[in-house]
Amino acid sequence: MNEIKLSQFEGADDRERFAAALSYMRERPGMTLFVEPGEYVITTPLARETMNNAITGKFGTNPEDVMFKPDFRYDRGLDFSGHISSRIIADGVTLMIDGFMEPVSVRDCSGVEIVGLTIDHVRKPYTKGRIISWTTLDRDENTAEILVDFPENFPINPDIIYPRYCTYVPDKERFGKDFGIRSFTYIDDHRARFVLERSDKSFVGNELYLWHSFHSRPAILIENAKDTVLRDVTIHSQPGMGIVGQKAENILIERLRVIPSVGDHISTNTDATHFASCRGLLRLDGCEFEGQGDDSINVHTYYYTVISHEGERCRLQIKAPTGTHAQSLDYPEIGDKLELTDKKTLLSVGEYRVVDCRPDFEGFFCDVVLDRALPDDLDDYFIADPDELPVLEFVNCRARNHYARSILIKCRSALIENCTVSDVFECAVKIAAEAWWHEGISTADVTVRRCRFINCGRRLTECGGVYVRMDCEDSTTKAHGLVTIECPEAHHGIVVKNTKQAIVRRNHIVSAKQNCCIEPGVEVL
């Protein structure tokens, strides 16, 4: 019998019952777990302590500085490590997470499929209130004082932190314009006064949201996993990203929804999905994104820094500002092709093969043997691993009202098709390697077609539609390969830079500024 039910397993709480079922399945590849519909509370003392410490400022005014570190202690909810061909059917099932943790870990496994699961939090990783009064303080300084009422399920405290905040405008069904908070005065658990900067009109009736974290653990981690499938999964909240994929191969995600729960307007505190150093096919089909604090999707590998080398031997380390997004070691595989990359232009200037690789998980570096010697002076170069990039298919998806860009592409091959993006703060699609973040690499063949981009680029950005560029020191570099853009409705323009070849056709563009800008030197086919 290859089918079991969660109700067959006992435990002191819901987390222990899931652990018992998953332990049973770990020893029996090919099992299917049916979870009866309902709410299941997943919690631990550490998760609750972490949440309280973060919200009350014990981790500082930005908890990411403490929580987004390799040595930070955290608990997991459902752990699929060691599983082979396991399925969990969880239609109508909600995991109510009490605290800050990693709710689902799909790691060191193969063939795991999750269907129908919803993830939410007992106490959201943000606080919501309603602005009930507005008083102008100084018209010249553009300051005002607001009184905010917080409901029973969002109590505040005198030490509450808010590394990010925003308003939601019900009449427009989107986040409001940027402003600053100069001071916070606690009245009681459900009322507070704030003095605002850059505030030129009344916000009365708007919702005020206070984030309590940026990056920490994701709602779902997919790491060192092969052939993972997520279907009809919903993520309503997480004190970090929704899904993080790291060193995973072949990921299929269908009808994912990273959206706020009913009555709220924030979903994940940062990226909805983020995939780093993955392989094979990465396909997202029919997914929906709304209210997250960063991109809908970001796909990239990392630029390694050579910290020492002699002949064909080298020691590589990722020196991204915040480390890897799983806070675990990234390293090339034996047989991978590596590219020597100019830091200023992000152009590949040489190719090598990995003969041997020995990762040091404690030191967070890897010792690599190449098929030939590296140049003597490597201060001006990165090492990139293009084999640690998937082919991306992002199709039939919708995204609206969220921060940052929506679709961020740093992989060699990608198809963005039949997608609608509206009311995002920056551009709908950005195709760009980013040297400062140590995230790459340049693309070879990216197609954006049959998409609609409406009212994007709400912040002062160069482009709100499709933005092709390289974020590096040399602004004249031509590192991208072929980019094809065919969209029937691309409000707010198309900008193509740093690209060898471009096909831009059959686009209907309505822009407040320049409709389409293709810099000199780009071959238009």
What are these regions (language model features)?
Residues 14-15, 19-36, 40-525:
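Extracellular parallel beta-helix/beta-solenoid repeat domains
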Residues 1-18:
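Right-handed parallel beta-helix/beta-solenoid
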